[in-house]
């Protein structure tokens, strides 16, 4: 079972590397990593387990956060209608994105960042993702609003990008016009 001790923190070189694609069939280790990542997210959202094991609540995690520079991510997040998006994605890529942008009112956080980073992180409000499941079956997934923000945050990790790289350095509270704000 993964715990917070397994998650590398900002400054670790794996967080700034571009992760490598996995090849299919996946190794047992790659499959286990995906399962463990999703299990961590589920456990972190369970109050009892989170308290017992000292887990910070998370809705997404990427392999580089575990010092594994492979293109694997997991998300476990509900949208505003309480629909669950729970996936382990291998080699995910953004196929298309909306022109409309969105951000979270309180900014973003990250399991690899142990400090508050004020500022808006503006992202696409909708994205279509191409990825594979653990059996190598191609997936085409559409995300909007909060789940879209989460999956973009995790794909950024696969490209060596941290959420605060998107924040306006001169004016972190600057919000471009017509950006939808959630939360």
From Swiss-Prot:
Q: What does the record say about how the cofactor binds?
A: Binds 1 Fe(2+) ion.
Catalyses: N-terminal N-formyl-L-methionyl-[peptide] + H2O = N-terminal L-methionyl-[peptide] + formate
Note whether Ribosomal protein occurs among the keywords: no
Which EC number(s) does the record attach to this protein? 3.5.1.88
Q: Where does Fe cation bind?
A: 110, 153, 157
Q: Which HAMAP family match?
A: Pep_deformylase
| Protein name (record) | Peptide deformylase
Q: Which gene encodes it?
A: def
């Amino acid at each position: 079972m993964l715990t917070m001790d397994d998650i590398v923190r900002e400054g670790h070189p794996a967080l700034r590397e571009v992760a490598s694609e996995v090849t299919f069939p996946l190794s047992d280790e790659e499959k286990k990593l995906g399962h463990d990542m999703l299990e961590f997210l589920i456990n972190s959202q369970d109050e009892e387990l989170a308290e017992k094991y000292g887990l910070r609540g998370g809705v997404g995690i990427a392999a580089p956060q575990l010092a594994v520079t492979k293109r694997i991510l997991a998300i476990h997040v509900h949208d505003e209608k309480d629909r669950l998006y729970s996936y382990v994605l291998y080699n995910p890529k953004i196929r298309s994105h909306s022109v409309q942008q969105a951000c979270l009112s309180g900014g973003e956080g990250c399991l690899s960042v142990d400090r508050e980073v004020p500022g808006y992180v503006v992202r696409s409000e909708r994205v279509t993702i191409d990825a594979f499941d653990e059996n190598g079956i191609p997936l085409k997934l559409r995300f909007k609003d909060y789940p879209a923000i989460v999956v973009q945050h995790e794909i950024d990790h696969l490209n060596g990008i941290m959420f605060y790289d998107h924040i306006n350095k001169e004016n972190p509270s600057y919000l471009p016009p017509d950006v939808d704000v959630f939360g």
